[in-house]
Amino acid sequence: MRQVSTPAAHQRRPGAAGIARCRLGILLVSVLLAALVQTGRAAAMSSRLNDAQTELEEDTLSEEVNDPTAMLTQLRLFEFYTPENFRSQAQTNVALVQPIIPIARLSLLPVEQIIRPTVKLSTTATGPGAHTVTGMSDIQLYDLFQSQWPHLERWNLRWAIGTTFVFPTATDRKNGAGAWQIGPAAALAFAGVPNLWVGLLVQNPISFAYTRSDAIPQNTMLFQPGFSYRLGHGWYVKSTDSVWTINWRHGTPTTIPVSFGVGKISQLEGQMVDTWVSGERMAYEQSTAVTPMWTVRFGLNFIFPEFVLGR
């Protein structure tokens, strides 16, 4: 009797080599997928860490850019526009370049220094009309030495003392005092409250030599109080731009302005940049000269946190 074959009788089971290759392929695909997932997680975590580090650096710098005692290298570019003045119909303007140069402790001078020259191009009113004159103003410079009292750090205080100078570089008599000046300078900073910085800068240049016979002797205190408050993500508000001028000589101008502004620390192609805008209003003035009524200020600061001379 002939035996009838069934389809199952002709089926062949895969050999051991085929099963091994199949398992190896599944294993390789699983490893590849796991590696891709892990790489994606690592990249996301690295991106979050970089973003967090950048944000922390921006928040820290938003305090230091306004601190006259901070060892922070900057190149500041300012524009001050005054549309209204007391005792004049003229609109005035000041373009200002102000590098800040910290110097580390050196063998011959074992203290930290902060040098800040200020160069101005000023458009100044010549009288009660609308006429103005534009030219270089006197160059100002201060050289501060950081305090070496470590116990002050426990109180979140930092201060510096030094000397201020004024050089008679003005190209027009309306833009300068016509006098060589030198005097004391000091700065103080307090950062004991989270996100808040409070400080002041005081200078008092006194004239000792003159470039013209009719120059008026100078003895003026420049008092610059201020505060800044960090808002996060590099944003901050501040009142640090107003300089009170208190003249010790009888009959010379005394002015007390107030200001308020907002700024942002950001990173552009690896370069830390501070941009800000503020408004200033004259709160008190005792003067017979042309004095700003209100002023709009713009600032662009290039920040170099890693660069300190001598390090």
Indicate residue ranges for each PLM-predicted region:
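Transmembrane beta-barrel domains of Gram-negative outer membranes and organellar outer membranes
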Residues: A44-R311
